[in-house]
Amino acid sequence: MSGIIATYLIHDDSHNLEKKAEQIALGLTIGSWTHLPQLLQEQLKQHKGNVIHIVELAEHEHTNSYLRKKVKRGIIKIEYPLLNFSPDLPAILTTTFGKLSLDGEVKLIDLTFSDELKKHFPGPKFGIDGIRNLLQVHDRPLLMSIFKGMIGRNIGYLKTQLRDQAIGGVDIVKDDEILFENALTPLTKRIVSGKEVLQSVYETYGHKTLYAVNLTGRTFDLKENAKRAVQAGADILLFNVFAYGLDVLQSLAEDDEIPVPIMAHPAVSGAYSASKLYGISSPLLLGKLLRYAGADFSLFPSPYGSVALEKEEALAISKYLTEDDAFFKKSFSVPSAGIHPGFVPFIVRDFGKDVVINAGGGIHGHPNGAQGGGKAFRTAIEATLQNKPLHEVDDINLHSALQIWGNPSHEVKL
């Protein structure tokens, strides 16, 4: 294989999966086949999409009810020749799912890139090992927290929040994805002020914290804004990838003048991936494609919290981010939304040590503030790695957190 193989979930009311698959393969490549003269068929054969796999799935009554018709469901795979497209994500997505995405009854499940095609993508600049080297933390999950309620607040408020989170033992603090360039907390001022706070905490407490600042602006201004952030001392760039496009992420990741990790936020991705019947699968969108395009971190809804993904999907995202691949470094999985210390044993069980535990309200909502919230998480992480049940840990911050949010791991065998 020198091109790409697309895997689709299809629904067909004519109950002929073979015909539907062939129509897709032709429609996204040469357009027609059987009515072409023999000579033209020979000329176009190397450009034709080829159906290589068809499996019928069991009938699904909920699907029939939703679509208001009886359909046959199936998984199909089509191989698209590399000759047909340039080696970039806009061309690949348009080839494999462009006008097909308008069908409304087809879901792009996966894309399998040939080695020849993979060579055209950067992958993460730092990856898991590189991020761990920056923090000098190699033996546990990382802990990340989020600035909360920053809109309409000034730099002084940001500095106080940042200091408390860092003292609490948080490894990474990220901007809220809805904090854009503004007069109260402009980009470079956030970075410079944040660096001062974090350096002070490091000198006093010996704990290093990185700050992920939100990279925003018009698309053609992003590189300039990113370079300004780097010059000001940015540790990490948070980026709302799907508001801009995967190719924009790749462009940032490939730029040698932007030598910092990139953290991909999933904002807007639900518009592409939320339906089970159409769109693009979450594992492909938030896992494989983000990694290939250069994300060092991928945030996605956890299977436990307030905006939950199904566990199978969340684990599939993580698999794509972390599986061995000779072409790409591994990206950090960041299962997010509604996370509190009681979920730490589940996160470590399901995602392993190479994960970023990301919390907002679970840190800021602690009775002892963000310092207490961070310490509760760090204690929960340490106890989990020692296989110690959280309810047996003698720690006031963790105990307070479990009283507020509960301890689901106490009720479930891990």
Swiss-Prot record:
Its EC top class is isomerase
| Catalytic reaction equation(s) | 5-methylsulfanyl-2,3-dioxopentyl phosphate = 2-hydroxy-5-methylsulfanyl-3-oxopent-1-enyl phosphate
Task: Give the record's pathway.
Answer: Amino-acid biosynthesis; L-methionine biosynthesis via salvage pathway; L-methionine from S-methyl-5-thio-alpha-D-ribose 1-phosphate: step 3/6
EC number(s) per UniProt? Answer: 5.3.2.5
> In the UniProt entry, which residues are flagged as the active site?
99 (proton acceptor)
Which controlled-vocabulary keywords does the entry list?
Answer: Amino-acid biosynthesis, Isomerase, Magnesium, Metal-binding, Methionine biosynthesis
> Which residues, renumbered to this chain, carry the PTM N6-carboxylysine?
174
The GO molecular function terms of this record are:
2,3-diketo-5-methylthiopentyl-1-phosphate enolase activity; magnesium ion binding; ribulose-bisphosphate carboxylase activity
Pfam families noted in UniProt: RuBisCO_large (PF00016), RuBisCO_large_N (PF02788)
Q: Does the keyword Transferase apply?
A: no
Per the annotation, how and in what number is the cofactor bound? Binds 1 Mg(2+) ion per subunit.
Miscellaneous: Has no RuBP-carboxylation activity.
Name the chain's protein.
Answer: 2,3-diketo-5-methylthiopentyl-1-phosphate enolase
Q: Which gene encodes it?
A: mtnW
